[in-house]
Design a protein with these regions (language model features):
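Short, helix-capping/interhelical loops that line the mouth of catalytic, cofactor-
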Residues: 1-7, 47-98, 105-110
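Helix-capping and short linker residues that terminate individual alpha-solenoid repeat units
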Residues: 27, 100-103
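Short, contiguous alpha-helical
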Residues: 5, 9-13, 17-20, 25-70, ...
Length: 128
């Protein structure tokens, strides 16, 4: 049975839509807490990519630079809004495929090498 997983999937869709809408409408270079807004968008995307499934068995995207997910740290890489939207598209598909692969019982289990249950990981991303 995967009724809870399907509910999670449906509740995840507006989160991704909100991120997409933000990237399509924000002033990417406006400063927010000392960093350009695009860095905060990347921070949210990277967190969803890394923490929704298993942060302890995760491979950084090819374009990622160490510390790039922390908007308060300087980085050389500058991602365009198109690149951010492509990354979002990748994360959405990865997340939906993952949720489709789960059963409700699996939400109470900890993924390999992870100290959190799958449900904890999901809930952490909803609050993020």
């Amino acid at each position: 049975m995967n009724e809870l997983c399907m509910i999670i999937k449906e509740m995840t869709k507006p989160n991704f839509l909100n991120i997409r809408t933000s990237i399509q409408t924000y002033d990417r270079d406006a400063q927010c807490c000392g960093a350009p807004c695009w860095r905060w968008a990347y921070h949210a995307l990277h967190s969803a990519d890394k923490w929704f499934i298993n942060p302890f068995l995760y491979e950084e995207p090819a374009f990622h630079e160490d510390g790039m997910d922390d908007p308060e740290k300087p980085c050389e890489v500058i991602l365009s809004d198109e690149e951010l939207l492509e990354y979002l598209k990748y994360i959405e598909q990865k997340t939906y495929d993952y949720l489709d692969s789960l059963t409700d019982d699996m939400l109470y289990e900890k993924p390999e090498e992870c100290r959190y249950t799958r449900m904890e990981l999901v809930l952490r991303q909803f609050r993020h």
